[in-house]
């Protein structure tokens, strides 16, 4: 039987790509692909793992200066997406699961993360501190110097900027897959 992995809010598919490459059945659910995690219905078969990356716009500390201007409703909408991810995890009871988000206020709602990392910890030479909650084996680190620094804030304003900032680093995606097949 083919193993299934759910990939939630992973528009780029970068985090789940190692599973696709290894022959897993990866079900990607993302609003930008026309599927809303808040409306996702339980699958009628076992799910081995769940990767969840709810949008960070309302949670990441890098955007804190805009939180007040956006108001409470945008936070409530973002929390509804994170809650939907947690509901999907609870319903499917996978062998492993992880929910990621950059350093920010999501920890106020989910508690202390299981781990935090920078892309440089897994071979990608830049920094972007990211937290993970869940039940999973921690990936083996392969640290390199972050010679590119914090390059995410240097991306020019464009319609693709948010998607580019949200791409899971390839080194981390591969290491996570190897630790959680």
Regions found by a protein language model. Name each.
Residues 1-181:
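Conserved active-site and SAM-binding loop architecture
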């Amino acid at each position: 039987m083919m193993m299934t992995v759910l990939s939630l809010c992973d528009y780029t598919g970068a985090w789940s790509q190692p599973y696709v490459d290894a022959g897993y059945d990866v079900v990607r659910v993302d609003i930008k692909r026309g599927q809303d995690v808040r409306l996702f219905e339980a699958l009628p078969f076992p799910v081995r793992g769940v990767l969840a990356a709810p949008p960070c716009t309302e949670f990441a500390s890098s955007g804190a200066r805009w939180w007040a201007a956006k108001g409470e409703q945008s936070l409530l909408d973002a929390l509804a997406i994170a809650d939907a991810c947690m509901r999907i995890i609870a319903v499917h009871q996978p062998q492993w699961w992880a929910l990621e988000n950059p350093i920010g206020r999501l920890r106020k709602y989910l508690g202390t993360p299981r781990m935090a990392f920078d892309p440089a910890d897994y071979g990608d030479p830049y920094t972007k501190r990211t937290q993970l909650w869940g039940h999973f084996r921690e990936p083996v680190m392969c640290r390199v110097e972050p010679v590119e620094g914090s390059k995410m804030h240097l991306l020019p304003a464009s319609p693709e900027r948010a998607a580019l900032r949200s791409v899971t680093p390839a080194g981390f995606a591969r290491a996570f897959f190897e630790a959680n097949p």
